C-alpha cells in the first residue's frame, strides 16, 4: 500500500556523497565592534597538495609559535587558531583582533616561515608530543561516541588513522618544511571573511567582494 511504499522509500540508503556547490564571496561584515575576526580559508587539495598527518603537528606549531607570537603576542589579538582536514579544507583565524591588514600579511607569511622552519630536536619532539597528546586525550563515553560517529560519517578507516599516527610520530623538520607547499596551495585560493569594525573594513574594502553591515 501507499504507507508501506513510503516507509520503504524512507529507508533507502544514500547512494553517494552530498555535494554542496560553494562560491567565493570574500565578505566583510561591518559592526560597531572595535576588534576583528579575521579568517583566511582554502582547499589545498584543489590547489594540488595532499593531506598528511604532519598537518596535525603544524596546528600545534602555529598555535604555540608562528600565529601565537605574531597575532597574539605582537599583534594584541585575544587568540588565533588553524585547522586542516582530510578533504583539503584549511583555515587560519584570529579573534578579537585589533588588526586586519597586518593579520592578512601574517597569514601570507606562513609559507616563508615553513620554508625556513628550523628548531631544536627538543622543540620538535615537544611539538610531536603535543600533537599525540591531543589525539590520545582521555574521553568519556559521550565523547567516544561523538568521535566514532564523526569518523564514520567522514568515512575514516582504522587504516587511515594508523597511517596518520605513523606520519606524526615519524615526522621531522624536513616534513614540516614540505608543508609550505600545502599552505601555498591553500592561500592561493585567496578566500577570506572578516567581521569587524566599520573603520577597519572601510580602510581595507579592496580586499572584499562584498561588504555588508550587521545590525
Question: What are the residue ranges of the model-derived segments?
Answer:
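An aromatic/glycine/proline-enriched structural segment found at the starts
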Residues: 1-36, 199-215
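In a subset of proteins, long, contiguous C-terminal domains/tails are tracked
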Residues: 170-215
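C-terminal structured domain segments
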Residues: 5, 161-164, 178
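Hydrophobic, Leu/Ile/Phe/Ala-enriched alpha-helical segments that form helix-helix packing faces
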Residues: 1-3, 62, 111, 180-183
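Generic recognition of flexible, low-complexity loop/linker segments
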Residues: 26-28, 67-68, 78-81, 177-183
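M16 family metallopeptidases and their MPP-like homologs
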Residues: 35-57, 63-173, 188-196
Amino acid at each position: 500500500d501507499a504507507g508501506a511504499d513510503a516507509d520503504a522509500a524512507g529507508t533507502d540508503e544514500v547512494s553517494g556523497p552530498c555535494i554542496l556547490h560553494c562560491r567565493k564571496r570574500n565578505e566583510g561584515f561591518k559592526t560597531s565592534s572595535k576588534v576583528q575576526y579575521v579568517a583566511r580559508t582554502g582547499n589545498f587539495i584543489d590547489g594540488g597538495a595532499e593531506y598528511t598527518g604532519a598537518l596535525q603537528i603544524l596546528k600545534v606549531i602555529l598555535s604555540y609559535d608562528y600565529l601565537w607570537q605574531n597575532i597574539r603576542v605582537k599583534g594584541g589579538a585575544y587568540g588565533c587558531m588553524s585547522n586542516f582536514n582530510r578533504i583539503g579544507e584549511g583555515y587560519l583565524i584570529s579573534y578579537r583582533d585589533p588588526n586586519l591588514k597586518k593579520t592578512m600579511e601574517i597569514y601570507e607569511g606562513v609559507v616563508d616561515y615553513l620554508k625556513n622552519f628550523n628548531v631544536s630536536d627538543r622543540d620538535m619532539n615537544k611539538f610531536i608530543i603535543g600533537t599525540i597528546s591531543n589525539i590520545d586525550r582521555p574521553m568519556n563515553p559521550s565523547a567516544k561516541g561523538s568521535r566514532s560517529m564523526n569518523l564514520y560519517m567522514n568515512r575514516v578507516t582504522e587504516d587511515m588513522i594508523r597511517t596518520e599516527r605513523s606520519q606524526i610520530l615519524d615526522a621531522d623538520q624536513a616534513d614540516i618544511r614540505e608543508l609550505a607547499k600545502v599552505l601555498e596551495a591553500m592561500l592561493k585560493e585567496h578566500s577570506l571573511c572578516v567581521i569587524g569594525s566599520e573603520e577597519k573594513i572601510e580602510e581595507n574594502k579592496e580586499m572584499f567582494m562584498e561588504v555588508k553591515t550587521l545590525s
